[in-house]
Amino acid sequence: MASIRGRCGRFATVQQFINKRLVDAARKHRVVVRLKGGDPMLFGRAQEEIAALEAAAIPYEVVPGVTSALAAAAEAGASLTQRGVARTVVFATPRVGEGEAPSNWAGSAASADTAVIYMGAGQAREVAAALIAAGAARDTPVLVSENASLPQARRIALTLEELPQIACYGITGPTLIMVGRAFAAALAAAEQEALRKYAKG
């Protein structure tokens, strides 16, 4: 087994190297498993790996997983869609690969009832500013989920305006920024807990 995953805030292993490892391993072994966190078809660069395998005439099977957005929502008890509150969901990332043109991710995310931002924790200040500039309200509830579905999972509830504060939390694991009124209950619970701790002194 060989780990080829990236780390939060650090450069991931070069994708071409991963593609080569896959092809080389498939030529050497009868069965090779490329295990990914979440679902490979959502921000998993699966298409590049599939293309490499197809170019090498190597048969493959993609087994779907549970993307971290759904795992985080289930863990928090906060559905991404809610009757009368959230009917549209956008999955987006502010990160742009080398040589890629920037996308209007913020405009798409701000116009949705619920937005889930992948790979944005290291750019929290920029994410908040971009969403607010695109029309999102400053008091929009935000739920930040680190290491969703893992034993060391952690959630931080705050408003969009407060999002830059997550820089103080020492986040190191894979993190989602989930934005929208669907997370109002999580924000209210966090505020009540903060008041309770303040009252206890």
Go through the PLM ranges and name each one.
Residues 1, 20, 77-83, 134, ...:
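Short, hinge-like loop/turn segments at secondary-structure boundaries
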Residues 4-11, 66-68, 87-88, 94-96, ...:
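Short, acidic/turn-prone active-site loops that include or flank metal/cofactor-
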Residues 17, 27-33, 45, 51, ...:
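A contiguous loop/helix-start segment that scaffolds small-molecule binding in enzyme catalytic cores
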Residues 39-43, 68, 122-123:
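Gly/Ser/Thr-rich loops at beta-strand to alpha-helix junctions
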Residues 51-72, 83-90:
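Short, acidic/small-residue loops that bind anionic groups at enzyme active sites
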Residues 2-3, 62, 82, 90-93, ...:
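Structural signal for conserved beta-strand scaffold positions within catalytic alpha/beta enzyme cores
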Residues 1-63, 162-164, 169:
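Class I S-adenosyl-L-methionine
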Residues 70-77, 153:
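Glycine-rich, charge-decorated loop segments at or immediately adjacent to ligand/cofactor-binding or catalytic sites
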